[in-house]
Design a protein with these regions (language model features):
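An internal, acidic/charged active-site-proximal segment
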Residues: 28-151, 236-244, 284-286
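Short, conserved catalytic/metal-binding motifs centered on acidic residues
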Residues: 3, 65-73, 88, 164, ...
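Basic, amphipathic alpha-helical segments enriched in Lys/Arg and hydrophobic/aromatic residues
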Residues: 202-257
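Short acidic, glycine/tyrosine-flanked loop/strand segments centered on an H-E-D-like triad
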Residues: 20-28
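Long, low-complexity C-terminal extensions of enzymes
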Residues: 237-286
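A conserved active-site cap/scaffold subdomain adjacent to cofactor or substrate pockets
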Residues: 159-166, 179
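Acidic, metal-ligating active-site segments
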Residues: 1-21, 114, 144-152
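Short amphipathic alpha-helical "interface-anchor" segments enriched in bulky aromatics
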Residues: 121, 173-204
Length: 286
């Protein structure tokens, strides 16, 4: 589970937490002493912990929009955000109920209502996409505040619409969906953490070791995000994490080569010893 914080054109991974199913926690506790047993923490509890940590760091009076996909869209989490005077924009599953009616039924109920055509810039180099949306206002089940739901289709004949909730009723559907697009960097972070930085390489390790590994990987991606921020130039795309990683590797290699040349010049009769000290494990051709 990840919490990403966008700041203007920049974005930083604020925190990551490992979610373990209740069954997995019971399994792990069989091999642990009573005083070291793990407590099960639900998705809501993990999200709440991260949001409360972030809240303490936010400037007073900040306008906050919390964005998440349908996996996290519980009434408890939505209500937590509303109690903090934050707004929520999130995806919803089709079986959620608005005014006691499933939201997927509203597509038929509103068939007399014309679609609103909106255009959203793509989050990648592809052309802008057009969507056809309808909105319906009411109360989501177990959420006391009035909200509105966006029914979004790729075309008027699309039979698999997507559903989104917005608690800020002053926003248009286009404004709400444009804000929701800012959630995309979370997916980029997730992919990069697992495939490049090795976040998923924690199998068969103790829970304590996993937490330490998460902290190390979190620091690594924050370094790359900070590097991207330093390299930012207005009216130019923000450097990708891959570009920042390559630049770091090149800088590290250059520093190593300079040190290698310097040491060999000082001690020309100890070439192999110097190579082994600076490049351990690499065989030297003779």
């Amino acid at each position: 589970m990840e919490l990403h914080l966008p700041i203007g054109p920049f974005g930083f991974l604020f925190d990551t937490r490992l979610y373990l199913r209740e069954k997995k926690v019971r399994h792990l506790n069989r091999a642990r002493t009573k005083e070291n047993r793990l407590a099960y923490r639900s998705k809501y509890n993990l999200a709440r912990e991260m949001l409360l940590e972030l809240e303490a760091l936010l400037p007073a009076g900040s306008q906050v929009y919390v964005l998440f996909d349908s996996w996290y869209a519980s009434a408890k989490l939505i209500n937590l955000c509303l109690r903090k005077n934050w707004h929520v924009i999130c995806a919803l599953k089709s079986n959620r109920k608005l005014e006691k009616q499933r939201i997927d039924r509203y597509d038929q109920t509103l068939k007399h209502k014309p679609y609103q055509k909106i255009t959203l810039e793509a989050v990648d180099p592809r052309p802008a996409r057009t969507y056809y949306v309808r909105t319906v206002t009411g109360h989501l089940e177990k959420v006391p505040k009035e909200v509105y739901v966006i029914i979004s289709k790729k075309s008027t004949r699309d039979h698999s619409p997507k559903y989104f909730l917005c608690t800020d009723t002053s926003l248009s559907a286009q404004e709400a969906l444009k804000l929701y697009q800012k959630r995309w960097p979370v997916e980029v972070d997730n992919l990069y953490l697992k495939q490049v930085l090795g976040l998923g390489d924690f199998r068969l390790q103790s829970f304590e070791a996993i937490e330490k590994w998460f902290a190390v990987v979190n620091l690594a991606i924050n370094y790359l995000q900070y590097t991207a921020m330093l390299a930012y130039q207005p009216r130019r795309p923000l450097p990708s994490l891959a570009e920042c990683r390559r630049q770091h590797q090149h800088a590290h290699l250059q520093a190593l080569l300079r040190l290698l040349v310097s040491e060999i010049r000082k001690q020309p009769d100890r070439v192999e010893a110097i190579l082994q000290s600076l490049l351990p494990g690499i065989a030297v051709a003779t």
